[in-house]
Amino acid sequence: MSNGMKENPLEALYAFFEEGTKETVVFDLEWNQNGYAPNLRMPHEIIEIGACRLNERGEVTDRFSELIRPRLYRRVDKHIRQVTGITEQELSSGRTFPEVFADFARFCGDSAQLITWGRDDYPVLRRNLEYYMQPSPFSPPLDAQLVFGFAHFGDAHRQMNLHAALEETGTQLEVPAHRAVYDAECTAALLPAVSTGLEGLGEEKRNELSAILEREKRIADSVLRSRPTHYSVHTDALRDDAVTNLLCPLCGRKMSFAVAWFDAGRDRYEAIGRCAQHGQAHGQMHLKRGTNGYLTMHQRVFLASDDEVKAVSEAYRLFLLTPPAKRHHRLCMEEVRRVSERQNFPSKKG
């Protein structure tokens, strides 16, 4: 082109899009919460959806922006109000989430590649949909933040925030920060730089990135569960099937354990479950202590690759080889339950 611009500045990025993609939609969410008394079915309530549609040259051709009247958390968290400027008065005149989401889904269409900056938006969107008993019509979006980190720094886990990435790439865009549609526009403005970074990758690196993105999609489609308990210590929680059960991310049935829950470090538990119909899944669980002193279980379960099963199995083998005195109080479910049985303290079956 005579002006030196590429005819299709997103060409290298398209190689990582879903097959059959006809359009590109970048979206961003703002959400509210109550850190003191969260509803565990929907700990983060979406209060704004913003998006922009792009043509093949990466230019914004249409925008979507709407505030949402909250159902659970009517008072806007102080930090969220400071960052976004969104007020309770503005939200009170908004439409409900189901109404706004229906219009957003129509805006996206049936064959758009969705893109976000970061991995947080899609799980929050799914939990909001589940709260209203609606299925997600979308496949997991492409995480532009992850691709940017991999393409520019060789590290998919190097997470640069949106506005730092704009500065890093010299991308100029004069829009207010931390409102959904403007953050979506900022992400869209970065996509040519993301795509340019991919152009220099060899086949081996491209395959590595494809594998990372495939795993991220499986994680994005996780079964997410949160459950309050009346336990103040991990040993009690690990005896309760209602806390430790693994549910298949596809059919929702209870799975058997191929690798039982064990503390992989920092009170983060891992397990491998087996579904007779859908194969093996990777479980991750955190037992978080609340202000009342009791533990709340937060669990994520997603389909596991063979490599992930091997890695978790090996970590468990090494855990069992470590003498208990050197585990720094790390626990595993099987040992806790064996001790309980010897002490005639049966596990709670769920």
What are these model-derived regions, one by one?
Residues 38, 87, 91, 112, ...:
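A general structural-boundary detector
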Residues 2-16, 193-350:
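Acidic two-metal-ion nuclease catalytic site recognized across multiple nuclease folds
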Residues 2-123, 222-225, 283-330:
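Conserved non-catalytic scaffold segment of RNase H-like nuclease domains
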